Each structure stands twice: as structure tokens, then as C-alpha cells.
Amino acid sequence: MKIQTDAANVLQRASAQLKSGLLKEKPLWYDIIAKYPPTSTNDLIKKSHVYEGKSDPRNNSIIYKYPNSNNKNNNVLFKTRPSNKELKSKNHNIHKLPKLKFIEDSLRKIFYQQHPWELSRPKNLIDNGNGNNNEKCDWSHMLQLHKPLDGESVVQRTLWLLKNNTTKGLTMVEAYDKARFEFYKLRMSEEMESHVAKEESTMYGSVFTSTTVNWNLSKEQEYINDWTIIAKERTQVIEANMNKSSAPIGSVVEEEKSQSSLFEDLLSNDNLQSEPEVEQSGQQQQQEQPKQETN
């Protein structure tokens, strides 16, 4: 982008217009701009910093000597690399959005790492419109009317203890432990109430059907049983096909099949020798029959 010089040359243009008569009166800002002129265009260009002297020991080997001069003062050191201080001061992440960090996130991370099975409990995501669902909650106590008991209750209770406990200064760990033990007591009481209610209902003759999870598992087991029968049939077919030799002639499988005992070889040779004798005797009988007919 081209550097704009109109604002920097405003004093020169106003002076030229006053001399030429385009401006009848001197502007009110003329004397102020003349006393404190704006920065020139040369000041807008960043210049490299030059060290004078031998303050930087890294540049001792980089010395430029003017020709035909024996004066030591003519030696000038030039900076060739940024210093560690300048490297640290560089803001490389100037265009990167900063990551927002909240205490609630760290508390949630710690709680669910210590209690992973709390994540398996079903939750209802309810939004009242304004995005703040904790307005009706009073975190001076753990149990709430408009919110079920979960890990978020521990987080909000811990923050309330840190802000409102003025009598005794609690640390983060102490407030978290206090909220966590309150959560344990309420969770155990809920489980005891559910067990007692189930025992009372069974005592009065109520029958509990299978849950949705058990029903899904039973349906899945039915399909598995059907597929076991099909798998057995298919494996039998595959094994039967594997027993059939599909090896080419002359292979090891064919040689093993062609191997026979000595007794089997002798029997086969005797059969081959007896077959031509039977054929010859049959031909002689056929020749004798027409001779008898002629006689």
C-alpha cells in the first residue's frame, strides 16, 4: 500500500494557497501546525538499530574496517541478529485469540476425573432462553429444586463457598472437599430412598418389567442366536469345500494321494495280466462256433 503524504504536507499546501491567494485568511490551526509539525514520511519507515561501540560481544568477529585507515575508532559494529530480550518481547500470537480460562472448568475437570461414572448418568439439557439456568438456584445449600444433583452442583457450591464464606477463609481445596462431602451424603440418601421404595413396592405386589437396556440386550441376543445357527451351516460348507483337493497335477497333495501299498500294486498288475487272457479265450470261442456251423 502506498504511503499517504497528504496529511504530512498540509502545512506546505496551506502556505502555498495563502501565497497564491486561494485562501483569504490564515486557518486557525496554521500556527500550531507550524510550531508542532507532523511527522515526516521518513519517520514512518522502521530503521534498523545500529550498535555503536563494542557493547555486544557476539559482534566482535563482525567488524568492518574502512580501507586505508589505521584508526581504531573507525571500526564499527553492526547488529546482525536480535538479542534474547528482543526475541522475548516479540508478540508472535498477536492475531491469535486468547484462550479463556475459568475456575469452573478446572473444578469440572478435577471432579469428573475423580468420578468418571457420573458422566454415565442421563442429563436433560434445558435452556430457559437467557442462557443462565442457575438464576433460580440458591447455592447456600447443595440440594436444589430446579436442578438435579450432579457434578455441576459441586462446582457451583464450591464457588459460593469461596465468595460468601467470610467468617473463615477457605482455600480452593478446602471448599471443594466440603462441597464434595455434601454431594456424597445427598447421593447416598438418594440411593437408599430408591432401594427402600423398590422393596416396599415389591412387598405390595408390584411387578417391575425389564428396563430399556435389558430389553435391547434381549433383542440383540435373539439375533445373535439366529446367526450362530447360520454360521454353523456355513462353516460346515466351507470345511467340506476345503476337503476337496483343488491342487494341480504333480503337486504334493496329488503325490500323497497317488501313493499306494505294494500289495495294491501287485493286485493291479495281476488284474491287468488276466484281462488280455480272458479276451483271447473269448475270441477263440467265437472262431470255433462258426466252424461247427459249417460242418
UniProtKB/Swiss-Prot annotation:
GO terms for molecular function: structural constituent of ribosome. One of its GO terms (cellular component) is mitochondrial small ribosomal subunit. Its main location: mitochondrion. Residues 249-295 are annotated as: Disordered. Residues 273-289 have a biased composition (Low complexity). The keyword Ribosomal protein applies. It is found in: Mitochondrion. Pfam families: MRP-S25. Keywords: Mitochondrion, Ribonucleoprotein, Ribosomal protein. The keyword Metal-binding does not apply. InterPro entries: Ribosomal_mS23_fun. Belongs to the mitochondrion-specific ribosomal protein mS23 family. Component of the mitochondrial ribosome (mitoribosome), a dedicated translation machinery responsible for the synthesis of mitochondrial genome-encoded proteins, including at least some of the essential transmembrane subunits of the mitochondrial respiratory chain. The mitoribosomes are attached to the mitochondrial inner membrane and translation products are cotranslationally integrated into the membrane. Component of the mitochondrial small ribosomal subunit (mt-SSU). PANTHER family: 37S RIBOSOMAL PROTEIN S25, MITOCHONDRIAL, SMALL RIBOSOMAL SUBUNIT PROTEIN MS23. This is Small ribosomal subunit protein mS23. It comes from Candida albicans (strain SC5314 / ATCC MYA-2876) (Yeast). The gene is RSM25.
